[in-house]
């Protein structure tokens, strides 16, 4: 095989394809988690900036972030359907 030559997926051993699929799934999970966490933080910041009463309890935002994070991860888990093999 020459440098830069592409390999057809049918030429790869099954184990390589499984590993690649698993790695893509993990990366997708991290990416989804990052997007969810970023959205939660930005929403929280905009709410704080727009709130006239900034002296609210410091525990309350943390609890809301954790609840939103759990909801986001639950939606992520439901969206991942196992592949038929």
Curated annotation (Swiss-Prot):
Disulfide bond entries? none
Topology in the lipid bilayer is annotated as: Single-pass membrane protein
Where in this chain does the entry annotate a coiled-coil region? none
Region (Disordered) residue ranges read 51-85
* Keyword Cytoplasm belongs to the record: no
Q: Where in the cell is it found?
A: Membrane
CC annotations in GO: membrane
Q: Which domain of life is it from?
A: Eukaryota
- Where is the chain membrane-spanning? 21-43
Q: Which UniProt keywords apply?
A: Membrane, Transmembrane, Transmembrane helix
What name does this protein carry? Answer: Small integral membrane protein 2
| Taxonomic source organism | Homo sapiens (Human)
């Amino acid at each position: 095989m020459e440098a830069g030559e592409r390999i057809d997926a049918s030429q790869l051993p099954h184990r390589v394809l499984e590993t690649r699929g698993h790695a893509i799934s993990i990366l997708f999970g991290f990416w989804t988690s990052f997007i969810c966490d970023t959205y939660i933080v930005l929403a929280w910041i905009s709410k704080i900036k727009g709130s006239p009463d900034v002296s609210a309890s410091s525990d309350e935002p943390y609890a809301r972030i954790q609840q939103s994070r759990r909801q986001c991860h639950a939606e992520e888990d439901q969206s991942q359907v196992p592949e038929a093999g």
